[in-house]
Amino acid sequence: MSKHLRGVKPQITADREPLVKAPRPPSFFGPLALAEWKRIMPVLIGRRVICAADLGQIETYCVMAGLVREIETQRQLAGGVIDGRLFGVQNRAAQTARQIAATLGLDPVSRARIATGGDDAPDDDDPLAV
């Protein structure tokens, strides 16, 4: 099993051809997915870590995050009743959104990886270093 399948992620670095301006959001987005797009795109553009090839992944993240919120809103409007089928859909959408967020640097651990230069940063105070 390769180390990349065990959850070890490569260092996030600036892209060679990063987007410098957020493209228009897809027309099929619902209001919650659109709100997520508007929230994350300035952050991702500012970090210079995404290119045009990443837009499909970002679209999927926004749709999944919007779906999680939409199902939660429906649950609250139904008086807090939990529909087992919708809970399963919400759970899978949340998992997908969380996984994509980690690859895009949108969670605390991946942001720390960006700030520190990755997991392979040398440790200057290693007592065993010669």
Q: Residue ranges of each PLM-predicted region?
A:
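Arg/Lys-rich, low-complexity, intrinsically disordered N-terminal tails that contact nucleic acids
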Residues: 1-38, 110-130
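Generic N-terminal initiation segments characterized by hydrophobic and/or small/turn-forming residues
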Residues: 2, 16, 52, 83, ...
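An amphipathic, hydrophobic-aromatic interaction surface with interspersed Lys/Arg
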Residues: 26-78
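Aromatic-residue detector
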Residues: 45-48, 90, 109, 127-129
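Amphipathic alpha-helical protein-protein interaction segments
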Residues: 59-64, 68, 75-120
